[in-house]
A protein has these predicted regions:
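Catalytic cores of NTP-dependent nucleotidyl/adenyl transfer enzymes across multiple folds
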Residues: 2, 116-169
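Short, flexible turn/loop "capping" segments at secondary-structure junctions
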Residues: 12-16, 60-63, 104
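Metal-dependent nucleotidyltransferase catalytic core
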Residues: 20-39, 71-109
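Active-site nucleotide-donor binding segment shared across nucleotidyl transfer reactions
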Residues: 38-78
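Short, flexible, solvent-exposed loop/turn segments with mixed acidic/basic and small polar residues
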Residues: 54-61, 100-103, 117
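Catalytic cores of processing enzymes, dominated by hydrolases/peptidases
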Residues: 102-123
């Protein structure tokens, strides 16, 4: 698994406005799981399932968004993307290993992220790490509050924190 570290100038594109961090909300998780069930019904013909991902899945404070990760096999990559493009009527962002779709539900920003290759390996590895290391998960949550004064600083800290963990695995 290749760990990616952005150059310092990459973060200059982010604003210096604060990142609103909200405490974990169990009602939001229940609603997100319902959304995920509906998404998985739509995905059923592809044989791919969306997994709730990120802070909400870990029951941590976060930005209040709902994130879903999908890991299609190579032969299911394009059928999955085709289905999602038709459903969401477009793509938010795309590169070789990550395609992101945006939606909104019940006042929450929703990200549906399709991953493959090293990006998928990194995503799975960090979630597994946090599930197994409660102390690191608590440190991650505390760091969100320490670095939320600026979106630029928040993402610089978060990306490097995750890269440090992945390099240690």
């Amino acid at each position: 698994m290749r760990v990616v570290r952005e150059q310092p100038e990459y973060y200059e594109m982010f604003s210096t406005r604060p990142v609103p961090i909200r405490p974990f909300d169990p009602d939001s998780k229940r609603a997100a799981l319902d959304y995920g069930a509906r998404l998985n019904e739509r995905l059923a013909p592809t044989g791919v399932a969306a997994e709730l991902h990120g802070s909400l899945a870990l029951e941590l404070a976060g930005k209040g968004e709902w994130e879903y990760s999908l890991y299609p096999s190579p032969d299911r990559w394009y059928p999955t993307l085709t289905l999602l493009v038709n459903h969401f009527r477009g793509v938010y962002s795309m590169d070789e290993e990550v395609v992101m779709f945006n939606d909104a539900c019940a006042g929450h920003h929703v990200e549906v992220i399709v991953l493959r290759g090293d990006a998928a390996a990194r995503n799975r590895a960090i979630m597994q790490y946090w599930r197994e290391h409660l102390d690191a998960r608590a440190d991650y949550e505390a760091g969100k509050y320490r670095h939320c004064h600026s979106k630029r600083d928040y993402y610089r800290w978060k990306d490097n924190y995750i890269a440090d963990i992945l390099e240690s695995l």
